[in-house]
Amino acid sequence: MSFSDVLQLAKIGKRDLASILLKEEFGKMQSPEQRVNLCKWIASCFEGLEDYGSAAEWYEMTGLLSLGETSSDSANAIRALPEYEKARAYYTLCDEEEKVELCSSVIAQLNKCFVAS
């Protein structure tokens, strides 16, 4: 099944099935960069579908994966920060207070990484 087929499933309301299929594809990928790019793509797809809760989860996952992408902590922080900021914004829209606080905490830590470097 192609990614466009999976997106079509999401558009017709079969988001649970689409999510399962995307996670299976995600598990097959070896490269951290591929995983980060897939997460960003999935997040933007959910954003386009106005499913902001799912978009937030995928942006948060993108940020998490970005933290381990290279051996440079500061480079990883630079990549992860905008993803956590997007996740926090969408969690805010969805009134997910606990997740907003978690993202805010991670963002504060990432900002400290910039100051330290």
Q: What kind of feature is each model-predicted range?
A:
Residues R35, A55, E60, S72-D73, ...:
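Residues that mark the junctions of alpha-helical repeat units in TPR/alpha-solenoid scaffolds
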Residues R15-D16, P32, Y52, A77, ...:
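TPR-repeat structural position
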Residues S4, W41, M61, S66, ...:
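"A position-specific structural signal for the A-helix of alpha-solenoid helical repeats
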Residues M1-Q30, K112-S117:
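N-terminal alpha-helical interaction modules that lie
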Residues M1-S4, E33-L38, L49, M61-T62, ...:
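Generic helix N-cap/helix-start motif at coil->alpha-helix transitions
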